């Protein structure tokens, strides 16, 4: 049986941390930013962890990550 391939879109969007958590960038920060307040854009900065409920689907998309 061949090896399972990693989803290209997932490997560009997610990074696995040494502790087993997965980090991702915030959404809603690409365009239509003029309507959004400075406070809202500031809160969308930075990296956040993936929620536990989404970890199953992330693990299927990243088979070599060992999640």
Curated annotation (Swiss-Prot):
Record-level GO cellular component terms: cytosolic large ribosomal subunit
Pfam families: Ribosomal_L35p
Keywords tagged on the record: Ribonucleoprotein, Ribosomal protein
Biological process annotations from GO: translation
InterPro entries reported in the protein's UniProt record: Ribosomal_bL35, Ribosomal_bL35-like, Ribosomal_bL35_CS, Ribosomal_bL35_sf
Transmembrane intervals: none
PANTHER family with a match to the protein in the record: 54S RIBOSOMAL PROTEIN BL35M (PTHR33343), LARGE RIBOSOMAL SUBUNIT PROTEIN BL35M (PTHR33343:SF1)
Family: Belongs to the bacterial ribosomal protein bL35 family.
Species lineage: Bacteria, Pseudomonadati, Pseudomonadota, Betaproteobacteria, Burkholderiales
Gene Ontology molecular-function annotations: structural constituent of ribosome
Record-given protein name: Large ribosomal subunit protein bL35
Top-level taxon: Bacteria
